[in-house]
């Protein structure tokens, strides 16, 4: 509870600071849902229900990203966490499975391990932190291996189901015992996807690829 309260206080300070900066810079801040009418006009449905039309000469698409879903996950459950909900749990799970050996999964997993959870990490590639410098990965693997209950590389999650008692997971990998494994909670950390489903974006010449990424040039212009 103390750690979660501290996290919430940090978030509150950051958002309050951004609000102060917008006022100091005379930024007109609108809170609502935006829809593009064309390449020079956006309509905002405000939180109070009113409508604002905002013309512009140039716009910045900064809608952020969200945690990617796992293909083997058929439904949502409170016992299945992402990188956002993992920072807001009420108690530390006894057994935590981290799906994804990237920096997000390892960072959050190491926190839970320090808090007393038995953390198991599953990564579908042959190494933790895919794409990172191999020398750094070796050091991190030794360090994380000393606190993790288990690390399974070259391993995929083929099935995952959750109920009020636990999360049942089936893994497919060279070092995994056959059969299902049960965990108190599961953290899905398999990357992030862009929030590019912007209403009216198809009314512009902006190019969006099949994965949802906006096409830009070397100067990040659409």
What is the role of each PLM region?
Residues 5, 9-19, 87-88, 93-97, ...:
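Rossmann-like dinucleotide-binding cores of NAD(P)H-dependent redox enzymes
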Residues 31, 39, 56, 77, ...:
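Phosphate-coordination loops involved in phosphoryl transfer and adenosine-cofactor binding
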Residues 76-92, 181, 185-222:
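FAD-site-proximal beta/loop scaffold in flavoenzymes
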